[in-house]
Amino acid sequence: MRPAIPFSYPGIDADIARLGSLLPLGLRAAEWAPPAAPAILNLACGRADETGVLLDVLAPLGAARFYLGIDLRDPEIAEARARWPAAPMGPGGVAEIEFRVGDASKPGTTGLLPDFDFIFVRHQNFWHEPEAWNRLYRRALTALKPGGRLAITSYFEREHELARACLLQLGAAAVADLPHPQSRRLTDAPGKSVDRRLALFRLPEDGPRLAPIGSPPTAAHRTTPEPSRPISSGRALPRAGPAQPESGASPRMSALHTVGQLG
């Protein structure tokens, strides 16, 4: 799927093309194939530059049932809407593409939505707001269909490990973790590069134990699974948070506030 308007910064086209090669490797490593008409959630999506490649990889016949991107910032969501209008994508029909402003780390809803087959968080920002990202990941896991996959990419090795540990404590099972050998180095921070690591997670067979939002986490909530419970369709989905600014890559914000000036 081609963008309706050009990307905002030099280098993004090549970054997205490389992500399009990395994602299929991750899906194969995770031993997962998307359903014929997947529902896809892109959390803390910023300008959502990766929308086209997500739809190309996960719904190559244009049969995505629903694609939703959520971010805290109005300007970035406005740009995403302009770049990725809903349009015929192939013999499968028309993908329903939507972008919303919201913060998934906080209580609140953006309306009744289905559960999702694939949830993506690109360039997660765990170490800027660990508590907020803990809440965001918890909400993401409650929105994930049984058998679905949650994927994250990271700028930094250490931040990737922190996010991975958080998801494991929440009850997610790690199914793949790939370094990106062609990751483009960024110069605004040491050791930072575009989509440096890709990790995929699933719900455990009997479902993660998730404490209600706002309740103090206990050891059981952090580590112990409980018997399976249904994840109902039509749940009111929480709103997504932002991530950290980037140099020449799609900007993200932390889940609670802007970190620096985006450019």
Predicted feature residues:
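A short glycine-rich, Lys/Arg-flanked "PGG" loop and its adjoining helix->strand segment in the class I
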Residues: 133-146
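A short SAM/SAH-binding and catalytic strip from SAM-dependent methyltransferases
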Residues: 117-131
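Class I SAM-dependent methyltransferase Rossmann-like catalytic core
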Residues: 1-32
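Class I S-adenosyl-L-methionine
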Residues: 169-224, 257
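A short acidic, Gly/Pro-enriched loop at the edge of an enzyme's catalytic core
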Residues: 109-119
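Class I SAM-dependent methyltransferase SAM/SAH-binding core
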Residues: 53-98, 103
